Swiss-Prot record:
<comment type="subunit">
    <text>Homodimer. Homodimerization may be required to stabilize the binding of ScpA to the Smc head domains. Component of a cohesin-like complex composed of ScpA, ScpB and the Smc homodimer, in which ScpA and ScpB bind to the head domain of Smc. The presence of the three proteins is required for the association of the complex with DNA.</text>
</comment>
<dbReference type="GO" id="GO:0051304">
    <property type="term" value="P:chromosome separation"/>
</dbReference>
<keyword id="KW-0131">Cell cycle</keyword>
<keyword id="KW-0963">Cytoplasm</keyword>
<keyword id="KW-0132">Cell division</keyword>
<comment type="similarity">
    <text>Belongs to the ScpB family.</text>
</comment>
<dbReference type="InterPro" id="IPR036388">
    <property type="entry name" value="WH-like_DNA-bd_sf"/>
</dbReference>
<keyword id="KW-0159">Chromosome partition</keyword>
<dbReference type="InterPro" id="IPR005234">
    <property type="entry name" value="ScpB_csome_segregation"/>
</dbReference>
<protein>
    <recommendedName>
        <fullName>Segregation and condensation protein B</fullName>
    </recommendedName>
</protein>
<dbReference type="InterPro" id="IPR036390">
    <property type="entry name" value="WH_DNA-bd_sf"/>
</dbReference>
<dbReference type="Pfam" id="PF04079">
    <property type="entry name" value="SMC_ScpB"/>
</dbReference>
<dbReference type="GO" id="GO:0006260">
    <property type="term" value="P:DNA replication"/>
</dbReference>
<dbReference type="GO" id="GO:0051301">
    <property type="term" value="P:cell division"/>
</dbReference>
<comment type="function">
    <text>Participates in chromosomal partition during cell division. May act via the formation of a condensin-like complex containing Smc and ScpA that pull DNA away from mid-cell into both cell halves.</text>
</comment>
<dbReference type="GO" id="GO:0005737">
    <property type="term" value="C:cytoplasm"/>
</dbReference>
């Protein structure tokens, strides 16, 4: 199959799927190896991002999705009756930052770092699909572990968790959480 045909098929798959489409699924359908598929997708992403189009292809944790370009949000939003979600609280941003940099992590460890109860923030972040349960720790009581989701990556504009800004600290307990929250907010508002 020619590259141009493969690109057309990939474009159709990503568009039709709606949600982020896993690379493995693309490879399976087109019978491609991952290296070849990644190369083709990279070329497609570059083409979309650098052309005079209203859409782009985004990579999120080795999944691909078509999205409208951020600069056209004001126009796209008029198409929908967007229900404004209440902004996350300071506590929720703090918990989100702690989880992002320490995942998987237990609620007890989150509370130890923050020094206060974090039940409400964890519940709200779970409801927003920014964090999820990631199993249970193999210790007495089997506490739940939490990690960030693909939705977290999408909202903050990261391809993977490795794209988080590096912290210049040795101990998260010494971190000024306000600075980290502001850094997260800047990343999410690109």
């Amino acid at each position: 199959m020619e590259i141009s045909t493969i690109e057309c098929v990939i474009e159709s798959l990503i568009f039709s799927y709606g949600d982020p489409l896993p690379l493995d699924k693309i490879c399976e359908i087109l019978e491609l190896d991952k290296k070849t598929a990644r190369s083709i997708l990279k070329n497609m992403m570059d083409s979309y991002n650098n052309s005079n189009r209203g859409i782009i292809i985004r990579e999120i944790n080795e999944k691909y999705q078509m999205c409208s370009k951020p600069e056209y949000f004001d126009y796209v939003s008029k198409l929908y009756q967007i229900r404004q979600k209440q902004a996350l609280s300071q506590a929720a941003y703090e918990v989100l930052a702690i989880i992002a940099y320490n995942q998987p992590i237990t609620r007890a460890k989150i509370e130890q770092i923050r020094g206060v109860n974090s039940d409400s923030a964890v519940t709200r972040l779970t409801e927003r699909n920014l964090i999820k349960e990631a199993g249970k720790l193999d210790v007495p009581g089997r506490p739940r572990l939490y990690e960030t989701t693909d939705e977290f990556l999408r909202c903050f504009g990261f391809k993977s968790i490795r794209d988080l800004p590096l912290l210049d600290i040795d101990d998260l307990n010494e971190l000024n959480l306000q600075e980290l929250v502001e850094e997260f907010d800047e990343e999410g508002n690109k």
